[in-house]
Amino acid sequence: MMKYLDPKADLTFKKIFGNHPQRLISLLNALLPLSEAEQIHAIEYLPTELVPQLEGGKNTIVDVLCTDSRGRKFCVEMQMEWSDAFQQRVLFNASKLYVSQAKKGGKYSELQPVYSLNLINDVFEHDTPDFIHNYRIVHDKDSNKVIEGLHFTFIELPKFTPHSIADKRMMVLWLRFLTEINSNTKEIPADLLNDPEIGKAVEELEISGFTDAELRAYDKFWDSVSVERTLLDDRYQKGREEGKEEGIAEGMEKGMEQGMKQGMEKGMEQGMSQRSLEIAKKMLA
């Protein structure tokens, strides 16, 4: 029986999408909010290390980076855990890609859009069932007024359900590929194998195609994910406990303040009543 690796791991994700242009084009066209006229037809891979323009700036590395025949840039990230720091890194990397296009003496009008596709194996928007979140720079009162340049797509993989986007066949197939295949998979659904690019991607996930060193790196990746998840859970639990303690302390303090205030008011009322009684007695004497 054939065994498979999980496509979401760093090793497998880069192997599947980092050196196969047509496969990456299929993924991008399926998951990004591109109109028919905006579809990608050809790409060229770019180095995944983003070097800063200024000396002393911060170098960053992304999973997959490419440009198309129009000069548009596409940055793809597979992230196992959500954090505010990751969100800021996404913004930082996309901005750096946009700025890096500027050439000395060049025109700003020649700058091409940057699309950032982020696949998150975590839930970060808990108050909505929507799992695809597209962002761009729009007017706060009229969303039809757009400043072109930066486009962000975040997909919460755990929320994905095929029936919710049944009309988008390729999106469904690629998201099923990312969410349904793992080390426990015994049989690959026929509709995944029937698509040429996804079928080839499935073949590359066969465990027999990896070296012992690659398999060790694969296992190490999941160990690090487990450790990171534990640390995040511990921080979350600690934050809840601290918040609870602060809430109790604040409640006690507020209760004491109210008690003292009520006591003082009651004491003043009693004191005034006693004083009025004494005055009345003197007047009757």
Spell out what each predicted region is.
Residues 1-285:
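Elongated, amphipathic alpha-helical interaction scaffolds
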